[in-house]
A protein has these predicted regions:
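Extracytoplasmic copper-binding redox domains, predominantly the cupredoxin/blue-copper superfamily
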Residues: 22-148
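Sec-dependent signal peptide recognition
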Residues: 7-13
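Short, Lys/Arg-enriched N-terminal segments with co-localized hydrophobic residues
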Residues: 1-5
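Short, low-complexity polar/charged micro-motifs in intrinsically disordered terminal tails
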Residues: 13-14, 144
Length: 148
């Protein structure tokens, strides 16, 4: 019975590895031009699961990503100019983000993780961002409308 702790450790290691094998990394490109127009995140809406990650890919320079609305308990984030940035999605809810230098061009997006527990707060932020947008009005609302 001396090898029981070893078997238990091995079992827990295998269980952890199998659970992490189901996590997905979603890639979002920061682009000058994309399917939804100029200055855009592609895709602009991602539906993910708790435990997944999102990697914002700096396909063009001059872009970075900043959080605007997050589920309770998630720390604000701000990436560096022209650098890829990976975010672990640990909490259910709606994540709204933008590219600060192109916010007026409505370069923003939405990630839904599980249930949209903070949908009302996220919607209020989206409405405010849409009101301030000078270009591509309606694009962020279109992404938010996919949150179910």
């Amino acid at each position: 019975k001396k090898d029981f702790p070893m078997k238990k450790s091995l079992f827990l290691l295998m269980l952890t590895a199998s659970l992490s094998a189901y996590a997905t990394n979603h890639e979002i490109k920061m682009l000058d031009n994309g399917k939804d127009g100029s200055m855009v995140f592609e895709p602009g809406y991602v539906n993910a699961k708790v435990g997944d990650t999102v990697t914002f890919k700096a396909a063009n320079s001059g872009h970075w990503v900043q959080s605007k609305a997050l589920p309770e308990g998630v720390a604000d984030f701000l990436s560096e100019d022209g650098k890829d940035f990976t975010l672990k999605l640990d909490k259910e809810g709606v994540y709204v983000y933008t590219c600060p230098p192109h916010r007026m061009m409505n370069m923003s997006g939405v990630i839904q993780v599980g249930k949209p527990v903070n949908k009302a707060k996220a919607q209020a932020v989206v409405d405010e961002m849409e009101n301030r947008a000078m270009q591509s009005k309606g694009r962020l609302k279109k992404y938010m409308a996919q949150v179910k």
